[in-house]
A protein has these predicted regions:
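Short, acidic/polar
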Residues: 63-77, 139-154, 208-217, 331-342
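Primarily a LysM-type cell-wall glycan-binding module
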Residues: 1-21, 42-44
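Acidic/aromatic/glycine-rich contiguous surface patches that form carbohydrate-binding/processing clefts
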Residues: 339-377
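Glycan-recognition patch characteristic of GH18 chitinases/ENGases
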Residues: 49-148
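Conserved, mostly hydrophobic/aromatic
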Residues: 82, 163, 226, 267, ...
Length: 377
């Protein structure tokens, strides 16, 4: 696998001849909508060869139940574990089921381990600080939730449990760590591992609802795998910037490896793009699109794709039909490879993709070129 950057005047036909492949293969692997059109700065994955020495690594991924069957089937061969998103619970501790039977069945057919993913998402669809507090401080509710988890794992044959609790009260930090410990003690005798997903902290003292309740050292002690959610620096309601900048990821990893065993860490990988209208105004929302759609947009608008070397992330500007300026930050083969190299550099267990609902053949080609995905089944 090679990665090349399109230069002015390049055509897919010329690139195919140069690298001894076909236009059809390049168009398919890179999800190129119109093979006759490229744009400068666009990165392409070229079939053949390997990026360095391929090591074994774990590849976890989240998916919503509405993922297209064909998109799921393309991803599963490259996955170690799949986390359908997500099971919830109410204030009495009753689990609210997720219609993920199709995903669990497909995962097992591909030797991919399906995980029951439990969150503190409330009725309104967002993470609920209050619901999380109830679970962490009410023993009766906690008992009911854990027993419900065990029943559902047995009923649907999940491989293990993934905990993704966000926006908890800072004063619930100790209680959340204790819950992770208790969940592991309940599930380990059943042969079920427990993983957690935690915010990208750069120090133990980092404050804020997103960070304070996540105790890196405790999760590293009690959980079998710890997913670092190293994305969303650029987010829907924030100012335009790279979604998953490598320079910020390094700060997180520099801290994380001092308190979490490296063999337990999965590095978060984003699989989406944001399109901001300029000038950006506080409270305005970016539009979410797939990485492939971002490239198509650049091509259709004749925009040159640039690459921020500090963040290791691609971006471009364009003007829409109404004359409004935009900036788009996304991920491409170069940015994905930069993050996979961090896994090797920091000797981590692997990666975790959020999410695989958007088709991204380039992502899988780059992962395939760097890793042999471990299979637990």
């Amino acid at each position: 696998m090679q990665i090349v950057e399109v230069k002015a005047g390049d055509t897919l036909y010329a690139l195919a001849r140069r690298y001894a492949t076909t236009v059809e293969a390049l168009a398919f692997d890179n999800q190129i909508a119109d093979p006759a059109r490229l744009t400068p700065g666009q990165s392409l994955v070229i079939p053949g060869g390997r990026e360095g020495v391929r090591r074994c690594a774990e590849v976890n991924a989240y998916a919503y139940p509405n993922i297209a069957p064909e998109v799921l089937q393309e991803a599963l061969p490259f996955l170690t574990a799949l986390c359908p998103f997500s099971w919830r619970f109410d204030a009495q501790g009753t689990l609210i089921p997720l219609a993920d039977e199709r995903l669990v069945e497909a995962a097992y057919a591909a030797d991919t381990a399906p995980m029951l993913t439990l969150t503190n998402i409330g009725e309104n669809g967002g993470f609920s600080t209050e619901l999380g507090h109830v679970l962490l401080t009410d023993g009766t509710v906690q008992d009911a939730v854990l027993e419900g988890v065990v029943e559902r794992i047995r009923e649907r044959d999940y491989y293990g449990l993934n905990l993704n609790f966000e926006y908890l009260q800072p004063f619930d930090r100790v209680a959340y760590s204790a819950f992770v410990k208790r969940a592991a003690e309940r599930l380990h005798p059943l042969g079920c591992p427990v993983s957690t997903a935690i915010a990208p902290k750069e120090s133990a003292e980092q404050e804020g609802f997103l960070y304070a309740a996540h105790d890196y050292a405790a999760h590293g002690t009690y959980a079998d795998r710890v997913i670092l959610m190293t994305y969303e620096w650029g987010y829907t309601f924030g100012a335009p910037q790279a979604i998953s900048p490598v320079n910020r990821i390094r700060r997180v990893l520099d801290y994380a490896v001092t308190v979490i065993p490296r063999r337990k860490i999965l590095l978060g990988i984003s699989n989406y793009a944001y399109d901001w209208t300029l000038p950006w105004k506080q409270g305005s929302a970016a539009r979410v699109l797939s990485d492939a759609a971002a490239v198509e947009l650049a091509v259709s608008r004749g925009a040159e794709i640039r690459f921020d070397e500090t963040a290791a992330a691609p971006w471009f500007n364009y003007v829409d039909a109404e004359g409004r300026a935009h900036v788009v930050w996304f991920e491409d083969a170069r940015s994905v490879l930069a993050r996979l190299r961090l896994v090797e550099e920091y000797r981590l267990a692997g990666i975790s993709v959020w999410t695989i609902n958007q088709r991204n053949r380039t992502l899988w080609k780059v992962i395939e070129g760097a890793f042999n995905a471990e299979k637990l089944l």
